[in-house]
């Protein structure tokens, strides 16, 4: 075909005619793409396109017609050699700039090739030799084109003639120039559609004879500019001006995929595509970066990579001004502004703005994972996932932060890290105005509002908000644990769990609180900790409106309303609403206590219990109340303490309507109604409402007092008793009454004191109906009915109703007076006696009569005084029935009957 057309052209010259309209040029065998088509080519396909163009050019050279495509038609008269530029090539070069590729790339390969034109054999003269310096004109004009300047129109227009000197067209005679100017001005009237379809071949004559410019330049013969379309498609009826374009067009009709990959069986339209594809299997990377030594399979990938070193981002978005290294990235970015998502999944209807995203998404439905790791044989749905995974084995971290020098193995990780320095959060939720640093996080957050859970497990039908959650969930069914610790060989189902676990070995705590300086191993722990400073509670229960700091805590709380207990013990059948509770419960059966204290070798079944225990040795109290500055060892203590200030009582008894600040208090209170005492002492069979009471009671039998005061070496059976005792030395009274501002060293004392203001007496005797402010008072009162005296003196065998009475009695034998007055040095055997004595020095009289405003230093004096106002005579003589207002008068009266004081 090519040789036949070349022969026709030689015949045309022999007959002295103008070149035929359909003469073969490099354009005729070039495969050209529209801008829209070019955008869909990936870097590998663009590199392949370049190679095909060069191969076509070499074929033209082989049939000896390349000079007719490259140079201007020179109608020679035998004058010497001259250098010319094919302006049509320049115009086409400028018209076909597409993305980051242009014919300049091809021109670099062939611009030094010299062509020899032989004179027509009929004339017998040697034609002048033309050397093609550059296919595309000067580099200045090429740069102007990239800069946005358009000095030369795509067709023959008014600006063409004005730029002839820039195109290096030499020795143009005035007559020729005039005709050329006329032709260009006439050609400017050609319509836009005609300009696109026309391929002008500018013929500048050098003849001194009767052959000035060829008449083919005249606009009225526009068919000269129009190629003959002599290659029709039988399927669609569309015609093309060269066979290569026809072959390209026919591929979709024919479905001809004749080149097959021997490894994976994939089919390709072109041999060159297959050659590029094979590099995926062979791992061949012939293109190497001189800066960092990294290799690439395709030259276009190397070109893009170079921009990482140079920082060049030549592609700019006209909407927002954002710049990109690759044109494909710009095209993808533009879809954000347009909102266009042309690629739709036939399975679920989800739409995407990229074909690659659709292909990747479809693998979720098919489960195909074509990319396999050669080291651990793990398979992935995307090649990029495999590339990221490979860096785990190699330890490569190619992306470095310019701010802090930290390196990352993914570009996305570096981009995420940069946001920590900038604090930028450009993505905002329209529902709740919450802002996010990543778009994916915003999309995930939106599902909280919509309730959408698009990812469903095929085994158990559980639905999830995120694909990562589904992937993690699948490992529950498969039992897969692919991540292994090199230190202790422990395996994990998540990579994040492995990374966190490694910090146990390294001791690394990379997350630091800016408020208090505390460091944490996990970012989630830091986020949760920050809420302690801000008191932020973002998660709200829709049933009771209670708010929580963590979503996981809300999920656990919701099960209180639903009574759902999904975690069941296989040993005893007991069910739990939390996985951690089940794990903890299992250790009761196994007796396992894996957590050991390095200070005292004590072992614990829970890690949290060990962490709490360690603070006994260190004295650390990291949890501080922002209201009164009291510090606590545990967060639960701080949470409980906070309710003192807020007065919050969220737990309500369904029997009597009483409310409590703590759930444990409600559970304990319910047993009062039921009379339930589930916990029994193994020594004396005494039953108790709470397990902790049994533990305390057991120490009476064993005599164990493990808690010792560092100040006075006094020991206690309960830790709470030691804490209360320490306040005697420190003088600390952290509990304050909001009514009278009186302070107390114990919370229980404050609660009892509050009942003085409220008049509340919640404890009632079932035998006589008497009510009491304190539970201990009721217990003591019941012994009056039963006659029980549980506390016996080991010296004189005297028994007492209360333990405090026994303790006081023992001091008679020991003569101990531990309570000493700082003012006068007088000592007392009871704290109450010392308090009463202090009032002598201070003159304090805290007890006031509401009737006459008289004040007293003792409560007993106030009670005796009140009888004057009420006329009450509670003390009655059993002999004669006479009543008296005070007990001393009754005793004096009884002497008349011969009754002594101790009878």
From Swiss-Prot:
Keywords: Disease variant, DNA-binding, Isopeptide bond, Metal-binding, Nucleus, Repeat, Transcription, Ubl conjugation, Zinc, Zinc-finger. PROSITE patterns: KRAB, ZINC_FINGER_C2H2_1, ZINC_FINGER_C2H2_2. InterPro entries: Ikaros_C2H2-ZF (IPR050589), KRAB (IPR001909), KRAB_dom_sf (IPR036051), Znf_C2H2_sf (IPR036236), Znf_C2H2_type (IPR013087). Transcriptional repressor that targets mainly transposable elements. Primarily targets the long terminal repeat of endogenous retroviruses classified as MER11 elements which comprise subfamilies A, B and C. May silence transposable elements through the establishment of heterochromatin-associated trimethylation of 'Lys-9' of histone H3 (H3K9me3). Can also bind to certain gene promoters and other genomic regions. Represses transcription of specific MER11 elements during differentiation toward pancreatic lineages in early pancreas development. GO terms for cellular component: nucleus. Broadly expressed. This is Zinc finger protein 808. Belongs to the krueppel C2H2-type zinc-finger protein family. It is found in: Nucleus. It is linked to Genetic variation in ZNF808 is associated with non-syndromic neonatal diabetes. Its main location: nucleus. Transmembrane segments: none annotated. Residues 24-98 form the KRAB domain. A zinc finger (C2H2-type) spans 231-253, 259-281, 287-309, 315-337, 343-365, 371-393, 399-421, 427-449, 455-477, 483-505, 511-533, 539-561, 567-589, 595-617, 623-645, 651-673, 679-701, 707-729, 735-757, 763-785, 791-813, 819-841, 847-869, 875-897. It comes from Homo sapiens. The keyword DNA repair does not apply. PANTHER family: ZINC FINGER PROTEIN, ZINC FINGER PROTEIN 845. One of its GO terms (molecular function) is transcription cis-regulatory region binding. GO terms for biological process: cell differentiation; negative regulation of gene expression; pancreas development; regulation of transcription by RNA polymerase II. Pfam families: KRAB, zf-C2H2. It comes from the Eukaryota.
């Amino acid at each position: 075909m090519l040789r036949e057309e070349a022969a026709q052209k030689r015949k045309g010259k022999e007959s002295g005619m103008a070149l035929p309209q359909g003469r073969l040029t490099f354009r005729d065998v070039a495969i050209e793409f529209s801008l829209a088509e070019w955008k869909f080519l990936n870097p590998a396909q663009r590199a392949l396109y370049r190679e095909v163009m060069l191969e076509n050019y070499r074929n033209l050279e082989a049939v000896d017609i390349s000079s007719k495509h490259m140079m201007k038609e020179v109608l020679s008269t035998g004058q010497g050699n001259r250098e010319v530029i094919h302006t049509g090539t320049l115009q086409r070069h400028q018209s076909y700039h597409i993305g980051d590729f242009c014919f300049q790339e091809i021109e670099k390969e062939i611009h030094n090739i010299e062509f020899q034109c032989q004179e027509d054999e009929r004339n017998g003269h040697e034609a002048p030799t033309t050397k093609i310096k550059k296919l595309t004109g000067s580099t200045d004009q090429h740069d102007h084109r990239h800069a946005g300047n358009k000095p030369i129109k795509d067709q023959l227009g008014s600006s063409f003639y004005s730029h002839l000197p820039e195109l290096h067209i030499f020795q143009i005679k005035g007559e020729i120039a005039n005709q050329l100017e006329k032709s260009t001005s006439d050609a400017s009237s050609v319509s836009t559609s005609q300009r696109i379809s026309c391929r002008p071949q500018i013929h500048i004559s050098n003849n001194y004879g009767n052959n000035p410019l060829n008449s083919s330049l005249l606009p009225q013969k526009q068919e000269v500019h129009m190629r003959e379309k002599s290659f029709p498609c039988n399927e669609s009826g569309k015609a093309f001006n060269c066979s290569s374009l026809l072959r390209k067009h026919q591929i979709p009709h024919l479905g001809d995929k004749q080149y097959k990959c021997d490894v994976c069986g994939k089919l390709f339209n072109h041999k060159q595509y297959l050659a590029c594809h094979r590099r995926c299997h062979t791992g061949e990377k012939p293109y190497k970066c001189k800066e960092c030594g990294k290799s690439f399979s395709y030259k276009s990938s190397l070109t893009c990579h170079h921009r990482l070193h140079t920082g060049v981002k030549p592609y700019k978005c006209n909407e927002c001004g954002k710049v990109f290294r690759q044109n494909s990235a710009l095209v993808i970015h533009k879809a954000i502004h347009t909102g266009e998502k042309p690629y739709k999944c036939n399975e679920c209807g989800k739409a995407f703005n990229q074909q690659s995203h659709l292909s990747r998404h479809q693998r979720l439905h098919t489960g195909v994972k074509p990319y396999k790791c050669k080291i651990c044989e793990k398979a992935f749905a995307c090649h990029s996932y495999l590339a990221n995974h490979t860096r785990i084995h190699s330890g490569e971290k190619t992306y470095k932060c310019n701010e802090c020098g930290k390196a990352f193995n993914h570009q996305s990780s570096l981009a995420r890290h940069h946001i920590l320095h900038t604090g930028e959060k450009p993505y905002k939720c329209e529902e709740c105005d919450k802002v996010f640093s990543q778009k994916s996080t915003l999309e995930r957050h939106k599902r909280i509002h919509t309730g959408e859970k698009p990812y469903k497990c095929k085994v158990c039908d559980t639905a999830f908000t995120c694909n990562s959650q589904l992937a993690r969930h699948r490992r529950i069914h498969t039992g897969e644990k692919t991540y292994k610790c090199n230190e202790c060989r422990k395996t994990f189902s998540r990579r994040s769990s492995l990374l966190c676990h490694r910090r146990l070995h390294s001791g690394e705590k990379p997350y630091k609180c800016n408020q208090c300086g505390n460091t944490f191993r996990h970012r989630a722990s830091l986020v949760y900790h920050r809420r302690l400073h801000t008191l932020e509670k973002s998660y709200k229960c829709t049933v009771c409106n209670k708010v929580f700091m963590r979503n996981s805590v809300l999920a656990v709380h919701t099960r209180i309303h639903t009574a759902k207990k999904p975690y069941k013990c296989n040993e005893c059948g007991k069910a739990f609403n939390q996985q951690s509770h089940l794990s903890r419960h299992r250790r009761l059966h196994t007796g396992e206590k894996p957590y050991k204290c390095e200070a005292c070798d004590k072992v614990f079944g829970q890690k949290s219990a060990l962490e709490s225990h360690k603070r006994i040795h260190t004295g650390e109290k990291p949890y501080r109340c922002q209201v009164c500055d009291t510090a606590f060892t545990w967060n639960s203590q701080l949470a409980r303490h906070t309710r003192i200030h807020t007065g919050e009582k969220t737990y309500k008894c369904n029997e009597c309507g009483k409310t409590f600040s703590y759930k444990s208090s409600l559970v304990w209170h319910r047993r009062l109604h039921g009379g339930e005492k589930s916990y029994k002492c193994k020594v004396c069979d005494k039953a108790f409402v709470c397990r902790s009471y049994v533990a305390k009671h057991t120490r009476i039998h064993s005599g164990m007092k493990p808690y010792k005061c560092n100040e006075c070496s006094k020991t206690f059976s309960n830790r709470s008793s030691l804490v209360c005792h320490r306040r005697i030395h420190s003088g600390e009274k952290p509990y304050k009454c909001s009514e009278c501002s009186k302070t107390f060293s114990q919370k229980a004392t404050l609660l009892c004191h509050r009942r003085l203001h409220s008049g509340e007496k919640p404890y009632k005797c079932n035998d006589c109906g008497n009510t009491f402010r304190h539970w201990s008072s009721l217990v003591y009162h019941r012994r009056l009915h039963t006659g029980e005296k549980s506390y016996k003196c080991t010296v004189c065998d005297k028994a007492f109703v209360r333990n405090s009475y026994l303790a006081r009695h023992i001091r008679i034998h020991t003569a101990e007076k531990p309570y000493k007055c700082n003012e006068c040095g007088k000592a007392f055997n009871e704290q109450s006696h010392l308090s009463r004595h202090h009032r002598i020095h201070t003159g304090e009289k805290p007890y006031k009569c509401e009737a006459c405003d008289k004040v007293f230093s003792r409560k007993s004096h106030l009670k005796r005084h009140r009888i004057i106002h009420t006329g009450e005579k509670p003390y009655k003589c059993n002999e004669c029935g006479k009543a008296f207002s005070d007990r001393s008068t009754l005793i004096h009266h009884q002497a008349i009957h011969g009754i002594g004081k101790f009878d």
